[in-house]
C-alpha cells in the first residue's frame, strides 16, 4: 500500500513541479494562393504543460503573466511546393522548433489565441500529401 501511495504522490509532484514542455512532431498544411492547393509536411514544434495560475483578484501592481509552452530556438526550412505554375513562387519557408521552454507568448511571432485554426487547416478544398 505504501508503494501505491508513493507512486501517487510522485506522479502528483511530477505534474505540479515539473514542466513537460518538449519538442513534438506535428503535421502542418502549407498553401500557396497561386497554386490553389495545400500539401502536408512534417515538422517539430513545442507542446506540453507549463505551470500557470490565474488570480481571482486582479492586482494592478502585480503583473499576471501566463506562461505557455513555446519555442526557445528555431530554424527555418524551405520546401518547394510541387505542381505550381511556373510564374508562381513555388517555395515555402516554415519554422522548425529546435528547443522549447515555458515562457511568455510572443505575439509578434506566435499565434497566442486560445483556439486557433490548427496547423493542418487548409483554405482550399484540395489537399495533396
Curated annotation (Swiss-Prot):
Gene Ontology biological-process annotations: follicle-stimulating hormone signaling pathway; G protein-coupled receptor signaling pathway; positive regulation of bone resorption; positive regulation of gene expression; positive regulation of steroid biosynthetic process; regulation of osteoclast differentiation; regulation of signaling receptor activity; Sertoli cell proliferation
GO cellular component: cytoplasm; extracellular space; follicle-stimulating hormone complex
UniProt GO MF annotations: follicle-stimulating hormone activity
PANTHER family: FOLLITROPIN SUBUNIT BETA, GLYCOPROTEIN HORMONE BETA CHAIN
Role, per record: Together with the alpha chain CGA constitutes follitropin, the follicle-stimulating hormone, and provides its biological specificity to the hormone heterodimer. Binds FSHR, a G protein-coupled receptor, on target cells to activate downstream signaling pathways. Follitropin is involved in follicle development and spermatogenesis in reproductive organs.
Subunit structure: Heterodimer. The active follitropin is a heterodimer composed of an alpha chain/CGA shared with other hormones and a unique beta chain/FSHB shown here.
Protein name as annotated: Follitropin subunit beta
Organism (species): Aotus nancymaae
Amino acid at each position: 500500500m505504501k508503494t501505491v501511495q508513493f507512486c501517487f504522490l510522485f506522479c502528483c509532484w511530477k505534474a505540479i513541479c515539473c514542466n513537460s514542455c518538449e519538442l513534438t512532431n506535428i503535421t502542418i498544411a502549407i498553401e500557396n494562393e497561386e497554386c490553389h492547393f495545400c500539401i502536408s509536411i512534417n515538422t517539430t514544434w513545442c507542446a506540453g504543460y507549463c505551470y500557470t495560475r490565474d488570480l481571482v483578484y486582479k492586482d494592478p501592481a502585480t503583473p499576471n503573466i501566463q506562461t505557455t509552452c513555446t519555442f526557445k530556438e528555431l530554424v527555418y526550412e524551405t520546401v518547394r511546393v510541387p505542381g505550381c505554375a511556373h510564374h508562381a513562387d513555388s517555395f515555402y519557408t516554415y519554422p522548425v522548433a529546435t528547443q522549447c521552454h515555458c515562457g511568455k507568448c510572443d505575439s509578434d511571432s506566435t499565434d497566442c489565441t486560445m483556439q486557433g485554426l490548427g496547423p493542418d487547416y487548409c483554405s482550399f478544398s484540395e489537399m495533396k500529401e
